[in-house]
């Protein structure tokens, strides 16, 4: 809807809402810019403390996806007028625990009365304007890495129905409460960018990425070129891959469905019909951009559209560096999986193979 409004023109806005990036970026001065994002939603689990942790993890994710460091947060609370305040206290405590882990300070917030509980944060981070990672810039030959398994949407739906196995719940909660901080730290500390193309509005511009996005160790043996990055959240894997492809210059993407990591219980939830409304909407919107290889199971197709809460990072990295990046992430405890590649644009935007 914001796209329908008259545009404001401010030269300090480095990243706005033109291209579905994960957060906005506003330059303060040489070497300093703010990263800003906001997210809040209804409970996806029964335990209030865990819900608070998940909400905080999800709210912080967009700052990490841009390569930023979270600094401050404002809590956003919708809560029933006659609700049990001890429940709200537990939600806030859960959120605080993750903000402390992230090194992000809660400096206030706002609450309103609402029949349905909702919770999240507006998060402000800091970033070097020359080190912003965007969802555009993927180049033919790049490999795609994913740092978390899919399935939180369908499993959360099973949880709401009281039909999720405890092992499914445990796996989903572990994923949804794991910050993308470590993965982002590895990427921002060890990458160097090369010249690339990013779409801006209706035009395509060439950017000298070595000056726009440079790592801290550009001349070291362990430097690697990350051309684009985003986190997998409400639009599902296909939706965010679509955004990355459209934001890049004349590329398409091939996903290898057998390599896409899935949470325990994800396929079982799909087969049992635990389909969230967001998944259906994602599929209706984006499936026109997808061509499936023969033999892809229906439940696999479905889970590729599953809306994720606090999902992992999707990273487009040069092929010659993907092995080193995987090694660094794995050494840091991040289970990065290579599950796709970027191709020159020809025909369908997204191709799904087995």
Predicted regions located by residue number:
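Helix-biased detector of long, well-ordered alpha-helical tracts
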Residues: 1-200, 204-209, 214-354
